[in-house]
UniProtKB/Swiss-Prot annotation:
Belongs to the NDK family. ATP binds at K11, F59, R87, T93, R104, N114. This is Nucleoside diphosphate kinase. The lineage of its organism: Bacteria, Pseudomonadati, Pseudomonadota, Betaproteobacteria, Burkholderiales. It comes from Bordetella petrii (strain ATCC BAA-461 / DSM 12804 / CCUG 43448). SUPFAM superfamilies: Nucleoside diphosphate kinase, NDK. It is found in: Cytoplasm.
């Protein structure tokens, strides 16, 4: 297994619940390192660009509305098998179907307000990381 980078977004619902630290602790306890991070308010244009792959889906407008409803915490995680490890820690998209002990089972309220986003593959991780963080702002450690 190789060292990978993946994007993680702690969404507005989890930021509002003040659980950023608890979520980051789960990543770190699983061996992932935070190598870039910031709290930011997404503009509608940025949210639409980031989720452009879903533009034709019926949930697109609601997703964008939700993602601009409050600040998000974006971070780059690095570690062995980081992409899959992050996805395992997050749990199923629908928190009702997420395994106990996963981030979404513990902190999410609904399929829309589901606490976190994580890249789903190496190709998307590279694009998503670059969307938020120029290479100069990423610091492997």
């Amino acid at each position: 297994m190789s060292v990978e980078r993946t994007l993680s977004i702690i969404k507005p619902d989890a930021v509002a619940k003040n659980v950023i630290g608890q979520i980051i602790a789960r990543f770190e306890n699983a061996g992932l390192k935070v190598i870039a991070a910031r709290l930011q308010q997404l503009s509608r244009a940025d949210a639409e660009r980031f989720y452009a792959v879903h533009k034709e889906r019926p949930f697109f407008k609601d997703l964008v509305d939700f993602m601009v409803s409050g600040p998000v915490f974006v971070q780059v995680l690095e570690g062995e098998g980081a992409i899959q490890k992050n996805r395992d820690l997050m749990g199923a998209t629908d928190p009702k179907k997420a395994a106990p002990g996963t981030i979404r089972a513990d902190f999410a309220d609904s399929i829309d307000a589901n606490a976190v986003h994580g890249s789903d593959a190496a190709e998307t991780a590279a694009v998503e990381v670059a969307f938020f963080f120029p290479e100069i702002n990423i610091h492997s450690r």
